[in-house]
Amino acid sequence: MKRLIFLALILCLALTACKPASQEPAITKVTLNLTYIPNIQFAPFYVAIEKGIFAKYGIEVSLAYGNEADLVALVGSDNQQFMIASGEQVLLSRAQGLPVISVREWYKDYPVGVASLKTSQISQATDLRGKVIGLPGLYGANYIGFEALAAHAGLTDADYELRSIGFTQVEALVTEQVDAVVVYLANEPVQLRARGYEIDVLRVADALSLVGNCLVTNEKSVSDRIELVQGMVSAMQEALAVTAADPDMAYEISRKFIENLAEDDPIQKQVLLESIKLWQLETDPADVEVTRWENMQTVLLDLGLMKKQIEAREAFSDAFTK
């Protein structure tokens, strides 16, 4: 009997040894393109890398930075698969035949506004009549957001002067070179208040709903790389929630990705907090409103930036947030 038991044990061990070693889940390497340069507002993606959130979904992400128009061409041609892009860039690109598509909106509120010193008494959009407004240039989200706000208030280009000042909004305003400046809500207003200035801020989002930044891929990925796209969307959602729940942790992680970010920079910490207020943290597909895309398309057509109307509903997919 003992001999039979011994033989049975030997057989079990032999069978166990013959089993193939458990395989590690396949890792897909992708590049996630972010615009401009490393910035605290990209904290969720730094968190997703450092905390292994992308890895959890079988994805190894490398970050790259560059000009939005150049990057969207790479994604549209399927030379690369993912980027963070503005909603207007998605629409403009699709109108030119690039098959890019938003799969997850990042912002619930359009992140642009108009800031002025309290002494200028610009408390509503109609107060901009006769004023000089500084902005980086006649392009991008600043320009589009301002024109949308002005048009909604019944103003035309003849009612104000737009002055291209580069990214010097804070200095241009406090030295009274201009009456108001177009800003990112989470950036320049924080700097101005930190320097002790009392300001008024007109939010574009309070006037009308426009689509902001999104996770963007291409139609080939949506149809042929469903699991990968779902993984990127799920990882982004989780990273946003983790960052919003612990901004101090996210800030500390961001220091590994942003050169010269100080250990304790109160302005940059506040920029992160203000950014979080603008994010879309919910995944309810009802949050993806076609109206936001249609409104943006109307603005682009009115400005002459788009030459033809497209089907706005085809610019985004909510299949990965359901």
What annotation goes with each model-predicted range?
Residues 19-21:
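Bacterial signal peptide processing site
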Residues 223-305:
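Secondary-structure end/capping motifs
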Residues 88-89, 168-260:
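Pocket-lining segment of extracytoplasmic ligand-binding domains
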Residues 14-17:
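C-terminal motif of bacterial Sec signal peptides marking the signal peptidase cleavage site
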Residues 296-298, 302-322:
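Hinge/cleft segment of the Venus flytrap/periplasmic-binding protein
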Residues 24-156, 161-165, 170-175, 179-186, ...:
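Short, glycine-/small- and polar/acidic-enriched structural segments
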Residues 2-8:
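Sec-dependent signal peptide recognition
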